[in-house]
Amino acid sequence: KVLHVAPEQCFYPIFKKQQNLNYTTADMESPIADLHFDLHKIPLEDDLFDVIFCNHVLEHVQDDHQCMKELFRVMKNGGWGIFQVPIDYTNKVTYQDSSITDPKERETHFWQKDHLRLYGLDYPKRLEKAGFKVDVFDPKTALGEIDYEKLRLNSSELIFIARK
């Protein structure tokens, strides 16, 4: 069972047609989502999904720790997830300031006008605080030269695999 939060258009048709997957999409508003809900309070039972994808969502939510705990709650024991976020690899800690509400200021501070924080090198620890065990995967080291654009990967981005 796979939960895909804010499903990317490039992956959606590929996953949707896989006969071996019980693939569920979720988003607050997207018309392609099977379910519509707020990630702060997922209206689903505990221990439901083997795999969860939630890419470039946590930087948009009010309480990322609460959302991480909810993702942990609906993940089965032995499950795993990929929860990519923008990370400033020059910052040791995540930067957030709720007083910054102007879109232009948010873009300056958080790299995008609708972001509420900019993660730092503490991102894996933040996932661990929600209960996950985290593995760091460097695609450049592991995969060498690949078509990063086709896979929608940033060649300088690490992938964090969160396990329960």
Give the role of each language-model region.
Residues 39-52:
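A short acidic, Gly/Pro-enriched loop at the edge of an enzyme's catalytic core
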Residues 1-41:
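Class I SAM-dependent methyltransferase SAM/SAH-binding core
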Residues 56-60:
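Short catalytic micro-motifs in class I SAM-dependent methyltransferases
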Residues 62-71, 76, 80-164:
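S-adenosyl-L-methionine-dependent methyltransferase catalytic module, highlighting the catalytic core
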Residues 1, 19, 45-47, 77, ...:
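Residue-level preference for short coil/turn positions at secondary-structure junctions
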Residues 5, 52-53:
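Hydrophobic beta-strand segment of the Class I
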Residues 53-55, 66:
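PRPP/pyrophosphate-binding module of the type I phosphoribosyltransferase fold
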Residues 32, 43-46, 61-62:
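Activation segment
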